[in-house]
Amino acid sequence: MTLRSMRNLLKHWRWFIPLLLFSSDAFAWGLYTHVYFAQLLLWAVPLTEPRFRRAVAAYPRLVLAGACIPDLSLVGRYHGAPALDATHDWEQTQRQLQQASTDAERALALGYACHLLVDVIAHNHFVPAHEKMWGETPLVTHAVAEWAMDRHIQHHLFATPAELCDAHRHQLSAFIEQHFDCTRESAWRSLRTLSCADSLLRGSRLHSACYRGACAFDDRLRQRFNHYLRETGGRMVQINRILSGDIPQWYAEAPCEKKARHRVGLCAPHQLRGRMPLPQNLFETEPG
């Protein structure tokens, strides 16, 4: 199979309607991948702020649960919580970190910040690169790349997003009510919908089908996915600057389509397929 064959397959976008129902520009990494990076934060990133080190030691699972909150932007509007549309905002993240008064709140805020930090690479590089390689069918390509990565790392998780949302629904709902203009009931309904949707899609095994198909069409997929995981993980130590009050210069939400295409257009085809150059310092102004 060739990349040309994959482009032809992706033209038949109607095959992927079930996937598109749960995919949007708000998502970059899937929920499984966000929990993976939050686990990496717990294990491998030395935090310089003592309060957050204490929070991680006391409530590690709340860090993982907090990493699921930003993706409520997909469902909040359907449960009377339109304020959840704006979850990928750095100033909102800073307010959460600064206002956290307990170890549990700090753990949730840390997981939330971790989500946004790694989304910089996903929105600005991972997703646009795969759209460039696999064909100009953005929503479908986005969904396939996202779910394929989730399947790539799923066996490394110690808890699924659905398990985390269900087990910590009271702490999550209270945290969301505190930081967004919504009721605790709306927050809980949004969490339940996100949890059920994630469980439904995992049960359907669509993510496995995406992974198998992508691997068949793209023989460098596993190598490239590991590159993104390694390089994104290597930049997670920069979360210490966020904890100290700094704000990255890169957006954690989807950039404009023209800008994203220009960025990946600067890379040679072999870089897109293998090791795309990524920004080293997320606090430096984005070039061009």
Which residue stretches match the model-derived regions?
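N-terminal leader/auxiliary helical segments
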Residues: 2-111, 117-288
